[in-house]
Amino acid sequence: MKLPIAKRIPHPHELHGDVREDDYYWLKDRDNTEVIQYLEEENRYYHEIMRPLQEQTEQIYESMVDRVPDSEMKVPVQHGQFFYYSRLDKNKQYPIYARKQAASRALLQDATEEVVLDLNELAEEDDYLSVTVQRMTTDHSRLAYLENRDGTDRYTIYIKDLNTGELLSDRVPNVYIYGSMEWCRCGDYIFYTTVDEHQRPCQLWRHRLGSDVESDELIFEEKDDTFTLFISKSQSGKFIFVYSSSKTTSEIHMIDTDSPLSPLQLVDERRDGILYDVEHWEDDLLILTNEGALNFQLLRCPLNDLSSKVNVVEYNEERYLQEMYPFRDKLLIAGRENGLTQIWVVHDGELQQISWDEPLYTVAVLSEQSYDTNEVLIQYESLLTPKTTFGLNLQTGEKQCLQVAPVSGEYDRSQFRQEQLWATGRSGVKVPMTAVYLEGALDNGPAPLILYGYGSYGSNSDPRFDPYRLPLLEKGIVFVTAQVRGGSEMGRGWYEDGKMQNKRNTFTDFIAAAKHLIDQNYTSPTKMAARGGSAGGLLVGAVANMAGELFKVIVPAVPFVDVVTTMLDTSIPLTTLEWDEWGDPRKQEDYFYMKSYSPYDNVEAKDYPHMYITTGINDPRVGYFEPAKWVARLRAVKTDNNTLVMKTNMGAGHFGKSGRFNHLKEAAESYAFILDKLGVEAEEKVLNHR
């Protein structure tokens, strides 16, 4: 089959005395039938290339499905007289949300299950389903949930009467994907945020149950197009907090849930560069702020005097404080120290760290727990330890293991190894990596290795257990995650050093990680693949230009690769919100810096690795046209005969197809491609179970 070749239509961009040629700009017009024809031609080519790998794909997929437990159930969380949980049955695509009425956890086994929401039933109507936020009224009689069926960020609120099982007539459209819906205490009103034409959440509304949505009252509007609007309820349920925030500045108002018709109360006005978060505890507000504290400090002030702030604990620059979890009897803080997630209990003005046994792990306080609880649920996992839920007794400080997530099939953790590695980046910066592999995988020299990275928005790539990774580990594949700058694994400064005019650090850190793995004989350029999605797709796309010779395969998923053009186009969803992350190319300094690494603008006439690229036609975060243009230019310019494929999902968005088996199928396809290029047989198995 011949290569798909996109036609070239000259479209120069001129700015700051510079001209950027963009012959594939026309691919942005999804209403143009030639655009759809080109995407479908690329899809046909993709399927032609993947046809010889069908058997390998199926073998990988089946090995992943074999790791799906017969049933999975989350540890029930108590709210009043009910315990709420979700469960996932072996052959189901989606979870089932349920509850049991019981006086204590010990009585749950004999209690009767009531299904609150079965996503499998909802999904029968369409190929795609996403349900994100779910909110229960205080009296447990009504459930509001957000639903989407096209892969965009525009969701609709549905409200279910749990006494009758029927949906109410209330339907609220155009609501943001998350952080966008809360009930007042009485359950007669629901607050929600809607998006503008660019899918930016910017308006807060109040809806009275049973009334026409057209009569809903606009409570607040965020008019600065570099800010977004989110809402969340305090742990105590007393307040709804309304967040106006950019990536560098925040402002918060609050609503008393007992007085839903009362006006908003401002906590602290926005000041450039000052970020803060709030919570309610006892008679005070807790404030987590970066004012005078790069890694954030914890303050408190009386509800009747918000200007009187005092420190809760002394600021420690080695600790990055990120989340507050106030309960009636104790205050827990989540954050980072020494490159790892941590949880502390506030006691007598000090932070007492909860200790764990492994050197590498990820730990988090589960969200949406009852303020009155004496048992806080904490989730723990590592590269080798499945998700484990502990109950922390707030009175004694003791941890009790409540559940270890089931792993289907044989799994002996003693046959695997996890470790932390350090590469030396530019200016001597030490770049952390986490690695997991089969014992003995490195005994015979360089091993096939997949290097993953993200490194943007301060998001972290922490060590987590993945049962679907086990079949690949058993084949001798080494998995490494590079915790590059742009994430916040090493604190807030780690993030600041990987954004804006420091963005190239993200890419050079990743390259340093790859070189370290080669130098230390973990792998070789002929045996290494690079993976990343979204902003991680930008990472591996930039690295393909800067140091593609280090990799045999590069796999960018929904990649952000046309940085300058996108950041100049304010008609694209979320563009204005991103200027504090990447820069504003209307400014000359930002323009030339962004151009220096943008993958699309730096494609050269040289050899590139094998590349497997995915995108979604309805993606609101990274337009399909970015990878489409990139692939078209690569096909026209690159000098090698290596395989380049692009798969466009014609019915989904940024997160691909919905349903867990669909996700596994897509993962199996990409792994089949990677293993084929790395020379690993799909049926090959290094591990012989003892």
Curated annotation (Swiss-Prot):
This protein's UniProt keywords: Hydrolase, Protease, Serine protease
GO biological process terms, semicolon-separated: proteolysis
Alphabetized PROSITE patterns for the sequence: PRO_ENDOPEP_SER (PS00708)
Database matches in Gene3D superfamilies: alpha/beta hydrolase (3.40.50.1820), Prolyl oligopeptidase, N-terminal domain (2.130.10.120)
Gene Ontology molecular function: serine-type endopeptidase activity
Signal peptide: none
InterPro entries for the chain: AB_hydrolase_fold, Pept_S9_AS, Pept_S9A_N, Peptidase_S9_cat, Peptidase_S9A, Serine_Peptidase_S9A
Catalytic reaction equation(s): Hydrolysis of -Arg-|-Xaa- and -Lys-|-Xaa- bonds in oligopeptides, even when P1' residue is proline
Pfam family of the protein (one): Peptidase_S9
Active site (UniProt): 534, 619, 654
Source superkingdom: Bacteria
Role description: Cleaves peptide bonds on the C-terminal side of lysyl and argininyl residues.
Family: Belongs to the peptidase S9A family.
Protein name per its UniProtKB record: Protease 2
Organism: Moraxella lacunata
Gene this protein is translated from: ptrB
